[in-house]
Regions:
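Terminal beta-strand-rich extracellular "head" domains
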Residues: 37-46, 51, 60-179
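Glycine-rich, low-complexity segments
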Residues: 1-43
Length: 179
């Protein structure tokens, strides 16, 4: 593992940084790749089936194979912000995180967050750690997308509702982190 030495004035001394190594030698916890996406328009559904929201990361190109052992990396995925809403106190929204590798179809990774008791304006707050061994290798292109459903159907659920003055955009961020 390399050492980063700081000079007496707090500046990095470039002679002490070895940039010739490979990513597997990066210190544990180092973010080596990231991707993100944002949504600036409303999205709603009445479906009890999982529906793609369009909140999707830009492509993330893997630097290390996925896993949980030394010499591998994991991807932390976060969804936050936005303005959830429902047209009824009985409406319940369920959000999920899906993944696509190398342009293949999106597949469900995990439930993200859920909200019950409609008439609310609340942000999303969801995360997963993707350590799927063998699912992604060096050079693979990975994208994550948020999906939503109205549990039981029949109500309007807004994954994000644009309302002037109270709506911040939702974001999705994926970070590849060295184990």
């Amino acid at each position: 593992m390399g050492t980063l030495n700081l000079g007496t004035n707090g500046k990095i001394q470039s002679t002490n940084i070895d940039l010739s190594g490979d990513w597997s030698n990066a210190p544990s916890g180092t973010i080596i790749s990231h991707a993100y996406g944002t949504m600036g328009s409303s999205f709603s559904t009445t479906s009890d089936s999982q529906v793609a929201t369009g909140l999707i990361t830009s492509p993330l190109v893997k630097k290390l194979p996925n896993g949980s052992a030394a010499g591998t990396s994991r991807i932390h995925v976060f969804c936050f912000g936005g303005n959830r809403d429902s047209n009824s106190e009985s409406g319940q929204d369920v959000t999920l995180i899906y993944r696509s590798v190398n342009g293949q179809s999106y597949t469900e990774r995990d439930y993200a967050d859920a909200q019950y008791v409609g008439g609310y304006w609340n942000p999303h707050c969801a995360s997963i750690v993707d350590t799927s061994v063998g699912a992604m290798g060096v050079g693979d292109t990975v994208r994550y997308q948020m999906y939503v459903r109205c549990r039981g159907g029949g109500y309007t659920i807004w994954f994000h509702r644009e309302i002037g003055g109270v709506s911040g955009s939702p974001y999705i961020i994926a970070q590849e982190i060295v184990n």
